[in-house]
Structures are given as C-alpha cells and as structure tokens.
C-alpha cells in the first residue's frame, strides 16, 4: 500500500452491527477495509470480521434436539435419514439440550408437558433457536379447542421458524432448517 507522505489510514468507528438497507455489517465497504482487503487478497488471505466468521461457523454447525410429541416426529425422523441427509447442511442431532443449538417442537403440546418444554429450553446454551413443526405445535392444530392443549408452543418458548402442515413433509422441515440458517446469517450471533 502506498500512502502519501504524512497521511495515515485510520479505521472508522463502528456504527452498529448491520446496515438495514443492505443487511451487511456496517464498515465492511469503507475505504480502509477495501484497501486492506485488496492488498491481502492478492497474497491469498481472506479478510473478514469476527462476527461474520462466528456466524458462518454457527450456520454450518447447528446441533438439534427433538421434542417429538406426536405424529410430526415421524417426518422429523425421516428428515434425518440418508434420503434427505440433513447433516450435509451442518444440521446434526444431539441427545442432550446442553449440546444443542436448535430445538424442534413437533406435535401437540399439552398443558402438562409445557413446563417440561420450558425446562428443556432453559437448559440449552445461548444462542438457542426453536423450530415449531406442524399445525399442532404452531397453533394447537386439530386439538385446538381441547381444555388440555396449549394453543401453540410460542406461548411457552420463543419460536424462530414455523413449519406449517399436518404433518409437514420432510422437505418442508428441511426448508425450515435452511430458513433458520438464513436468519442466523442475516441477524448474526454475537448480539441477538
């Protein structure tokens, strides 16, 4: 990099995490960053921000756990089998909530099961995500008017992705996983 005598490059102060217009980190297209990136790209280096690096790693290594309550769990099992192979997207199953980033709630959530769902959700490390799968988990489904059914798991835990259907297909659930990865890329993982 050639600089005129007496001039120095100073990185601008960060103004926030994401630019609302472009969805990219603010400051990634400034002159200082551009010159360093051009200089190092010729030498085989990649210049990025820490937030982008962590977000990239997190989207490619989502560990999920099941909270299968009814027939939607069969489609969830089908998604993890070799035909759809969700692990090629970095979406691997785990048995413990302490090792999981994503919880898939599939099926009818009853009032008696709601505290257990919240307890398992609280045991998951931050950042944690929830996919609500099927009509019963989304809003009570066929049993919506029953006295013992919670009308949607979003009344107990915050839901990030809703997958509609009764039961939704394995392709729909896989599409929901891809939407979750897209959401993580868009929002970042350091501050949520």
Swiss-Prot record:
Per its record, the protein catalyses: a quinone + NADH + 5 H(+)(in) = a quinol + NAD(+) + 4 H(+)(out)
Any one GO cellular component localisation term in the record: plasma membrane
Q: Name one GO biological process term.
A: aerobic respiration
| Places the protein is found | Cell inner membrane
Binding note for cofactor: Binds 1 [4Fe-4S] cluster.
| Binding site residues for [4Fe-4S] cluster | 71-72, 136, 166
Q: What is its main location?
A: membrane
Cofactor(s) the record lists: [4Fe-4S] cluster
Q: Does the keyword Iron-sulfur apply?
A: yes
Kindly give the membrane topology term recorded for this protein: Peripheral membrane protein
User: Could you tell me the EC number(s) of this protein?
Assistant: 7.1.1.-
Show the GO MF annotations: 4 iron, 4 sulfur cluster binding; iron ion binding; NADH dehydrogenase (ubiquinone) activity; NADH:ubiquinone reductase (non-electrogenic) activity; quinone binding
Q: Which InterPro entries match?
A: NADH_UbQ_OxRdtase-like_20kDa (IPR006137), NADH_UQ_OxRdtase_20Kd_su (IPR006138)
Q: What does this protein do?
A: NDH-1 shuttles electrons from NADH, via FMN and iron-sulfur (Fe-S) centers, to quinones in the respiratory chain. The immediate electron acceptor for the enzyme in this species is believed to be ubiquinone. Couples the redox reaction to proton translocation (for every two electrons transferred, four hydrogen ions are translocated across the cytoplasmic membrane), and thus conserves the redox energy in a proton gradient.
Subunit record text? NDH-1 is composed of 14 different subunits. Subunits NuoB, C, D, E, F, and G constitute the peripheral sector of the complex.
Q: What is this protein called?
A: NADH-quinone oxidoreductase subunit B
Q: Which organism is it from?
A: Sinorhizobium medicae (strain WSM419)
Show the taxonomic lineage: Bacteria, Pseudomonadati, Pseudomonadota, Alphaproteobacteria, Hyphomicrobiales
- Which gene name does the record give? nuoB
